[in-house]
C-alpha cells in the first residue's frame, strides 16, 4: 500500500501544529508502508502533487485540492483541528462577506469529508460529537510527543538562565480563542507580590504567513508594553527542534483560553511540548488539556479569565517544591503513552488491514 500524507501547512525548520502532525504521521507510517509527505515549504513552494495521484491511500485534513484523485483510492480525513469553531471565534459575530465565503467553504469541505471519507480521525473522544452524520468509521489519534532528545544538544546555544527569574512559557500563538491577557495580568500580579518571574511568548510569526493578521500582532504588542518589564516575546517563530530546549529552561508552561466551544473540542498541541519537556502546566478549565492535567497531576487548572487564580497557581508551583516535583514525575510517567509510534497505532492497524484486503 502506497501512502501519501498531505498538509496545506508549512513543513520545515519552523512548523505549527498541522505541519508537525503531518510530518510525524508520515514518519511513523513510513516505518510500515511506502509513504510520501506533500506539504508547503518555508520558501513558499509546494511539493509535487504527483504523489496524490499515485497513492493507494491519501491522508490529510479537509483542504483545498485534497480529494480522492482516482477510483480505487482510499482517503482518510484528519479532523483533529476543529477549524469551523476556530473560524467562528476568529471572525466574530459580524463576519465580512469574504469571511463568510471562507467559512462556508470550510463547512463544505467538512461535509465532503464526512460523506466520502473511508476513515475519519479525531484527536480524542469528545470530538466525535462534532460529526454525528459521519458515515465512515472514526478512530482516535491524539497529538503526539516527539523524541525527548530532539534539542538536548542545543541547550548550550541558548542564553543561560542562571541568575534570571523563573520563566513562564507561552508556547503557542495568540489566536482569538486564547487568553494571553490573563497570563500577562497574572505575571504582573506575581511580581508585584514579591515573587520574581517573567512571561515569555515563545514566538510570534506563524510559519504559514498567509494566516498572519496585523490586528493580532498589534494586540501582542499592546500586551508586551502593558506587561513590561515582566513580559517578553521572541521576535520569530522558534524552530521546531529547538522548542524543547526553551521549555526545559522554563519553570512552567502556560496555556490559557476563553470559555468557548473551541475550548471544549480542541486538543492544544502545545500541551505535548510540555509533556515532552516535563514542564508543569497551568491551563484553563475545560477541554482535553485541562482534563489530562487534572486527572494525571501535571500542573494546575484554573477558571477562565481569572488572573488571580493564575497568579496563585504560578506562586504555588514556584514555591511548593514537592508539588512541582510530583508534576514533573507525572509528566515523565505519561510521556510514553503519547509517543508518536503509540498514538498512530490505530491508524497503522487500519492500513495493515486494508493492505491484507488488497492482497
Predicted segment positions?
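Nucleotide-activated donor-binding/catalytic signature segment of Leloir-type glycosyltransferases, i.e.
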Residues: 165, 203-206, 212-247
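Acidic donor-binding loop of glycosyltransferase active sites
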Residues: 118, 245-264, 279
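A short, active-site helix/loop in glycosyltransferases that binds the activated sugar's phosphate group
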Residues: 110-138, 147-149
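Conserved donor-binding/catalytic core segment of Leloir-type glycosyltransferases
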Residues: 4-6, 121, 159-178, 184-187, ...
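A charged, aromatic-enriched C-terminal amphipathic alpha-helix characteristic of glycosyltransferases
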Residues: 305, 322-353
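Conserved acidic donor-binding segment of nucleotide-sugar-dependent glycosyltransferases
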Residues: 295-296, 300-307, 316-321
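Active-site proximal beta-strand in glycosyltransferases
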Residues: 71-93, 100, 121, 139-142
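Membrane-proximal helix-turn-helix segments that form the acceptor-binding/catalytic region
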Residues: 49, 83, 99-120
Amino acid at each position: 500500500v502506497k501512502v501519501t500524507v498531505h498538509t496545506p501547512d508549512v513543513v520545515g525548520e519552523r512548523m505549527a501544529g498541522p505541519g508537525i502532525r503531518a510530518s510525524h504521521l508520515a514518519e511513523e507510517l513510513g516505518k510500515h508502508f511506502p509513504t510520501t509527505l506533500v506539504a508547503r515549504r518555508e520558501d513558499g513552494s509546494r511539493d509535487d502533487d504527483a504523489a496524490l495521484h499515485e497513492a493507494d491511500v491519501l491522508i490529510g485534513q479537509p483542504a483545498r485540492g485534497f480529494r480522492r484523485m482516482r477510483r480505487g483510492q482510499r482517503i482518510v480525513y484528519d479532523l483533529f483541528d476543529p477549524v469551523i469553531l476556530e473560524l467562528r471565534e476568529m471572525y466574530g459575530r459580524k463576519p465580512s462577506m469574504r469571511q463568510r465565503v471562507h467559512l462556508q467553504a470550510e463547512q463544505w469541505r467538512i461535509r465532503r469529508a464526512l460523506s466520502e471519507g473511508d476513515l475519519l480521525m479525531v484527536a480524542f473522544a469528545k470530538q466525535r460529537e462534532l460529526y454525528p452524520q459521519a458515515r465512515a468509521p472514526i478512530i482516535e489519534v491524539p497529538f503526539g510527543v516527539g523524541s525527548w532528545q530532539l534539542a538536548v544538544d542545543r541547550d548550550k546555544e541558548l542564553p543561560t538562565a542562571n541568575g534570571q527569574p523563573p520563566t513562564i512559557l507561552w508556547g503557542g500563538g495568540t489566536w482569538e480563542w486564547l487568553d494571553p491577557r490573563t497570563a500577562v495580568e497574572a505575571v504582573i500580579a506575581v511580581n508585584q507580590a514579591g515573587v520574581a518571574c517573567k512571561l515569555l511568548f515563545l514566538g510570534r510569526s506563524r510559519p504559514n504567513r498567509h494566516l498572519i493578521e496585523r490586528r493580532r500582532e498589534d494586540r501582542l504588542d499592546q500586551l508586551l508594553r502593558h506587561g513590561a518589564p515582566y513580559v517578553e516575546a521572541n521576535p520569530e517563530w522558534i524552530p521546531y527542534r529547538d522548542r524543547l530546549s526553551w521549555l526545559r529552561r522554563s519553570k512552567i508552561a502556560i496555556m490559557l483560553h476563553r470559555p468557548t466551544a473551541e475550548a471544549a473540542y480542541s486538543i492544544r498541541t502545545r500541551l505535548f511540548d510540555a509533556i515532552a519537556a516535563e514542564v508543569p502546566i497551568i491551563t484553563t478549565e475545560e477541554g482535553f488539556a485541562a482534563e489530562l492535567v487534572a486527572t494525571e497531576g501535571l500542573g494546575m487548572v484554573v477558571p477562565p479569565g481569572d488572573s488571580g487564580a493564575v497568579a496563585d497557581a504560578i506562586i504555588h508551583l514556584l514555591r511548593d517544591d514537592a508539588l512541582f516535583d510530583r508534576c514533573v514525575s507525572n509528566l515523565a510517567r505519561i510521556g510514553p503513552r503519547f509517543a508518536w509510534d503509540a498514538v498512530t497505532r490505530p491508524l497503522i492497524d487500519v492500513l495493515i488491514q486494508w493492505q491484507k484486503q488488497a492482497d
